[in-house]
Amino acid sequence: MPLSRLSIQWKITLLTGLCLLCIVSLLVGLSLLRMNHDAQLIKAANADMLKDAAKARMQARSEQQAEIIQRFFTDVYLFGNQFSRQVAQLREQTTRHGVDAASVRKDLNQLVRDGLKSNPNLLSLYVVFQPDALDGQDASFHDQADAGSNEKGRFGAYWAQKASGEMTGLAVTEEMIADTSAMLDGSPFNTWQLCPLQTRKACVLNPYFDSASGTKVLMTTVTLPLIDQGKVIAVIGIDISLSRLQQLAVDGDRQLYDGAGSVSIVSPAGLLAGYS
Protein backbone atom coordinates (compact mmCIF):
# COMPACT_ATOMS: atom_id res chain seq x y z
CA MET A 1 0.00 0.00 0.00
CA PRO A 2 1.50 3.34 -1.00
CA LEU A 3 2.70 5.46 1.88
CA SER A 4 0.61 8.40 0.64
CA ARG A 5 -2.54 6.40 1.13
CA LEU A 6 -1.78 5.58 4.79
CA SER A 7 -3.74 7.36 7.40
CA ILE A 8 -2.05 9.94 9.54
CA GLN A 9 -2.34 7.52 12.50
CA TRP A 10 -0.40 4.80 10.66
CA LYS A 11 2.20 7.27 9.54
CA ILE A 12 2.76 8.39 13.13
CA THR A 13 2.89 4.76 14.27
CA LEU A 14 5.51 3.82 11.66
CA LEU A 15 7.60 6.89 12.40
CA THR A 16 7.45 6.16 16.11
CA GLY A 17 8.45 2.54 15.48
CA LEU A 18 11.41 3.59 13.38
CA CYS A 19 12.52 6.03 16.07
CA LEU A 20 12.23 3.34 18.73
CA LEU A 21 14.20 0.91 16.55
CA CYS A 22 16.97 3.47 16.10
CA ILE A 23 17.03 4.22 19.81
CA VAL A 24 17.14 0.52 20.72
CA SER A 25 19.89 -0.10 18.17
CA LEU A 26 21.86 2.85 19.54
CA LEU A 27 21.41 1.66 23.12
CA VAL A 28 22.47 -1.88 22.21
CA GLY A 29 25.52 -0.54 20.38
CA LEU A 30 26.47 1.68 23.31
CA SER A 31 25.95 -1.22 25.70
CA LEU A 32 28.18 -3.50 23.65
CA LEU A 33 30.81 -0.77 23.40
CA ARG A 34 30.65 -0.19 27.16
CA MET A 35 30.88 -3.93 27.84
CA ASN A 36 33.95 -4.20 25.61
CA HIS A 37 35.52 -1.19 27.34
CA ASP A 38 34.79 -2.66 30.78
CA ALA A 39 36.25 -6.00 29.68
CA GLN A 40 39.43 -4.25 28.57
CA LEU A 41 39.64 -2.41 31.91
CA ILE A 42 39.13 -5.65 33.85
CA LYS A 43 41.73 -7.42 31.70
CA ALA A 44 44.23 -4.60 32.25
CA ALA A 45 43.49 -4.52 35.98
CA ASN A 46 43.96 -8.28 36.25
CA ALA A 47 47.21 -8.06 34.28
CA ASP A 48 48.45 -5.31 36.61
CA MET A 49 47.44 -7.37 39.63
CA LEU A 50 49.28 -10.42 38.30
CA LYS A 51 52.31 -8.30 37.41
CA ASP A 52 52.34 -6.70 40.88
CA ALA A 53 51.98 -10.12 42.50
CA ALA A 54 54.86 -11.50 40.42
CA LYS A 55 57.03 -8.49 41.28
CA ALA A 56 56.20 -8.86 44.96
CA ARG A 57 57.11 -12.53 44.86
CA MET A 58 60.33 -11.81 42.99
CA GLN A 59 61.20 -9.09 45.50
CA ALA A 60 60.55 -11.41 48.43
CA ARG A 61 62.63 -14.21 46.89
CA SER A 62 65.48 -11.85 45.99
CA GLU A 63 65.54 -10.50 49.54
CA GLN A 64 65.60 -14.07 50.81
CA GLN A 65 68.56 -14.93 48.57
CA ALA A 66 70.31 -11.69 49.55
CA GLU A 67 69.97 -12.70 53.19
CA ILE A 68 71.52 -16.10 52.46
CA ILE A 69 74.50 -14.45 50.74
CA GLN A 70 74.77 -11.87 53.52
CA ARG A 71 74.72 -14.67 56.09
CA PHE A 72 77.55 -16.38 54.21
CA PHE A 73 79.76 -13.29 54.47
CA THR A 74 78.60 -12.62 58.02
CA ASP A 75 79.75 -16.08 59.08
CA VAL A 76 83.15 -15.39 57.51
CA TYR A 77 83.35 -12.04 59.28
CA LEU A 78 82.39 -13.53 62.64
CA PHE A 79 85.04 -16.21 62.24
CA GLY A 80 87.62 -13.55 61.37
CA ASN A 81 86.59 -11.42 64.33
CA GLN A 82 86.93 -14.34 66.72
CA PHE A 83 90.24 -15.34 65.15
CA SER A 84 91.59 -11.80 65.55
CA ARG A 85 90.93 -12.00 69.30
CA GLN A 86 92.95 -15.20 69.47
CA VAL A 87 95.82 -13.49 67.64
CA ALA A 88 95.66 -10.57 70.06
CA GLN A 89 95.76 -12.93 73.04
CA LEU A 90 98.86 -14.69 71.74
CA ARG A 91 100.56 -11.35 71.13
CA GLU A 92 99.89 -10.35 74.72
CA GLN A 93 101.94 -13.31 75.90
CA THR A 94 105.01 -11.56 74.54
CA THR A 95 104.20 -7.91 75.23
CA ARG A 96 102.79 -8.38 78.73
CA HIS A 97 103.95 -11.71 80.04
CA GLY A 98 107.43 -11.96 78.55
CA VAL A 99 106.88 -15.25 76.74
CA ASP A 100 109.69 -16.19 74.35
CA ALA A 101 109.20 -14.42 70.99
CA ALA A 102 110.15 -17.51 68.95
CA SER A 103 107.51 -19.58 70.74
CA VAL A 104 104.83 -16.96 70.16
CA ARG A 105 105.64 -16.76 66.45
CA LYS A 106 105.52 -20.51 66.05
CA ASP A 107 102.28 -20.63 68.01
CA LEU A 108 100.80 -17.89 65.82
CA ASN A 109 101.85 -19.73 62.69
CA GLN A 110 100.20 -22.89 64.01
CA LEU A 111 97.10 -20.90 64.99
CA VAL A 112 96.69 -19.73 61.39
CA ARG A 113 97.08 -23.30 60.11
CA ASP A 114 94.62 -24.74 62.60
CA GLY A 115 92.12 -21.94 61.98
CA LEU A 116 92.11 -22.72 58.27
CA LYS A 117 91.92 -26.47 58.79
CA SER A 118 88.82 -26.05 60.93
CA ASN A 119 87.08 -24.25 58.04
CA PRO A 120 87.25 -26.41 54.89
CA ASN A 121 85.11 -23.91 52.95
CA LEU A 122 87.92 -21.33 53.08
CA LEU A 123 90.75 -21.19 50.56
CA SER A 124 93.35 -19.55 52.75
CA LEU A 125 93.93 -17.63 55.96
CA TYR A 126 96.72 -15.24 56.84
CA VAL A 127 97.97 -12.76 59.43
CA VAL A 128 100.41 -10.02 58.44
CA PHE A 129 101.76 -7.69 61.12
CA GLN A 130 103.18 -4.24 60.56
CA PRO A 131 107.00 -4.10 60.88
CA ASP A 132 108.03 -4.84 64.48
CA ALA A 133 104.39 -4.59 65.59
CA LEU A 134 104.29 -8.15 66.92
CA ASP A 135 107.13 -8.07 69.41
CA GLY A 136 109.69 -5.54 68.20
CA GLN A 137 112.06 -8.38 67.32
CA ASP A 138 111.70 -8.74 63.55
CA ALA A 139 115.47 -8.40 63.11
CA SER A 140 115.96 -11.71 64.93
CA PHE A 141 113.72 -13.70 62.58
CA HIS A 142 114.93 -13.01 59.05
CA ASP A 143 113.90 -15.77 56.61
CA GLN A 144 112.37 -18.01 59.26
CA ALA A 145 109.27 -19.23 57.43
CA ASP A 146 108.65 -21.95 60.01
CA ALA A 147 108.09 -19.10 62.46
CA GLY A 148 105.87 -17.26 59.96
CA SER A 149 108.52 -14.59 59.34
CA ASN A 150 109.60 -13.25 55.94
CA GLU A 151 112.97 -12.06 54.63
CA LYS A 152 112.89 -9.00 56.88
CA GLY A 153 111.61 -10.85 59.90
CA ARG A 154 108.13 -9.38 59.65
CA PHE A 155 105.49 -11.87 60.80
CA GLY A 156 103.23 -12.77 57.88
CA ALA A 157 101.94 -16.33 58.13
CA TYR A 158 99.87 -17.50 55.17
CA TRP A 159 98.24 -20.92 54.86
CA ALA A 160 96.26 -22.30 51.91
CA GLN A 161 94.34 -25.54 51.46
CA LYS A 162 93.21 -27.55 48.46
CA ALA A 163 90.00 -29.49 48.04
CA SER A 164 91.95 -32.65 48.86
CA GLY A 165 92.75 -31.21 52.29
CA GLU A 166 96.43 -30.72 51.51
CA MET A 167 97.76 -27.60 53.23
CA THR A 168 100.70 -25.38 52.30
CA GLY A 169 102.18 -22.49 54.23
CA LEU A 170 104.50 -19.61 53.48
CA ALA A 171 105.66 -16.30 54.88
CA VAL A 172 104.19 -13.33 53.03
CA THR A 173 107.11 -11.55 51.38
CA GLU A 174 107.70 -7.80 51.28
CA GLU A 175 107.22 -7.99 47.51
CA MET A 176 103.73 -9.42 47.98
CA ILE A 177 102.90 -6.76 50.55
CA ALA A 178 104.05 -3.95 48.24
CA ASP A 179 102.52 -5.42 45.04
CA THR A 180 100.45 -2.70 43.36
CA SER A 181 99.73 -4.52 40.08
CA ALA A 182 96.15 -3.98 38.93
CA MET A 183 93.46 -6.54 39.66
CA LEU A 184 90.28 -7.13 37.63
CA ASP A 185 88.64 -3.96 38.95
CA GLY A 186 91.76 -1.85 38.51
CA SER A 187 92.56 -1.65 42.23
CA PRO A 188 96.10 -2.54 43.40
CA PHE A 189 96.78 -6.15 44.36
CA ASN A 190 97.75 -5.15 47.91
CA THR A 191 94.29 -3.69 48.55
CA TRP A 192 93.93 -6.61 50.97
CA GLN A 193 96.32 -4.68 53.24
CA LEU A 194 95.68 -1.07 52.22
CA CYS A 195 91.91 -1.16 52.75
CA PRO A 196 91.86 -2.23 56.44
CA LEU A 197 94.92 -0.07 57.16
CA GLN A 198 93.28 3.04 55.73
CA THR A 199 89.66 2.49 56.74
CA ARG A 200 90.33 0.70 60.05
CA LYS A 201 87.32 -1.46 59.16
CA ALA A 202 86.65 -4.88 57.68
CA CYS A 203 86.84 -4.92 53.87
CA VAL A 204 85.50 -7.23 51.17
CA LEU A 205 87.59 -7.19 48.00
CA ASN A 206 86.14 -7.31 44.50
CA PRO A 207 86.55 -10.66 42.69
CA TYR A 208 90.06 -11.42 41.43
CA PHE A 209 92.17 -14.34 40.24
CA ASP A 210 94.84 -15.93 42.42
CA SER A 211 96.95 -19.08 42.10
CA ALA A 212 98.60 -19.20 45.52
CA SER A 213 96.76 -22.45 46.30
CA GLY A 214 98.26 -24.14 43.22
CA THR A 215 95.49 -23.49 40.69
CA LYS A 216 94.05 -20.30 39.23
CA VAL A 217 90.89 -19.52 41.18
CA LEU A 218 88.37 -16.69 41.00
CA MET A 219 88.02 -15.56 44.57
CA THR A 220 87.38 -12.74 47.00
CA THR A 221 88.92 -11.78 50.31
CA VAL A 222 87.56 -10.54 53.62
CA THR A 223 90.20 -8.59 55.55
CA LEU A 224 90.04 -7.25 59.09
CA PRO A 225 92.33 -4.85 60.95
CA LEU A 226 93.84 -5.83 64.29
CA ILE A 227 93.89 -2.63 66.34
CA ASP A 228 95.86 -1.96 69.50
CA GLN A 229 95.85 1.40 71.30
CA GLY A 230 94.23 3.08 68.32
CA LYS A 231 96.72 1.77 65.75
CA VAL A 232 96.33 -0.96 63.15
CA ILE A 233 99.10 -3.40 64.00
CA ALA A 234 98.13 -6.30 61.72
CA VAL A 235 95.80 -7.40 58.96
CA ILE A 236 93.91 -10.68 59.00
CA GLY A 237 92.79 -12.03 55.63
CA ILE A 238 90.34 -14.76 54.68
CA ASP A 239 90.23 -15.94 51.06
CA ILE A 240 87.00 -17.43 49.71
CA SER A 241 86.48 -19.22 46.41
CA LEU A 242 83.66 -17.70 44.38
CA SER A 243 82.54 -21.22 43.46
CA ARG A 244 80.65 -21.05 46.74
CA LEU A 245 78.81 -17.92 45.57
CA GLN A 246 78.19 -19.63 42.24
CA GLN A 247 76.49 -22.49 44.09
CA LEU A 248 74.39 -19.99 46.06
CA ALA A 249 73.30 -18.42 42.75
CA VAL A 250 72.36 -21.84 41.31
CA ASP A 251 70.43 -22.77 44.45
CA GLY A 252 68.61 -19.44 44.34
CA ASP A 253 67.69 -19.95 40.69
CA ARG A 254 66.21 -23.37 41.42
CA GLN A 255 63.93 -21.85 44.05
CA LEU A 256 62.74 -19.13 41.67
CA TYR A 257 60.11 -20.43 39.23
CA ASP A 258 61.86 -23.80 39.02
CA GLY A 259 64.96 -22.34 37.41
CA ALA A 260 63.09 -20.54 34.60
CA GLY A 261 64.88 -17.27 35.39
CA SER A 262 68.43 -16.36 36.26
CA VAL A 263 70.27 -15.09 39.33
CA SER A 264 73.34 -12.84 39.19
CA ILE A 265 75.59 -11.86 42.08
CA VAL A 266 77.39 -8.63 41.21
CA SER A 267 80.10 -6.84 43.18
CA PRO A 268 79.89 -3.08 43.91
CA ALA A 269 82.39 -2.54 41.07
CA GLY A 270 80.07 -4.35 38.64
CA LEU A 271 82.10 -7.57 38.45
CA LEU A 272 80.11 -10.78 38.13
CA ALA A 273 80.71 -12.97 41.19
CA GLY A 274 78.08 -15.63 40.50
CA TYR A 275 75.52 -16.43 37.78
CA SER A 276 72.97 -19.10 37.03
Which residue stretches match the model-derived regions?
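Short, Lys/Arg-rich, polar N-terminal cytosolic tail immediately upstream
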Residues: 1-5
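Juxtamembrane extracytoplasmic/periplasmic/luminal helical "stalk" adjacent to the first N-terminal
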Residues: 8-14, 19-111, 117-123, 202, ...
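Amphipathic alpha-helical bundle/coiled-coil segments
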Residues: 55, 70, 186-190, 239, ...
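Stable alpha-helical elements in mature extracytoplasmic
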Residues: 104-108, 121, 188-192, 245-248
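Solvent-exposed, extracytoplasmic
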Residues: 107-115, 235, 239-276
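Extracellular/periplasmic ligand-sensing ectodomains of membrane signal-transduction proteins
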Residues: 116-201, 207-214, 272-276
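Short, small/polar residue-rich loop motifs at catalytic or cofactor-binding pockets
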Residues: 215-220, 257-260
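A short, hydrophobic, proline-anchored segment that marks a local hinge/packing element in signaling
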Residues: 220-230
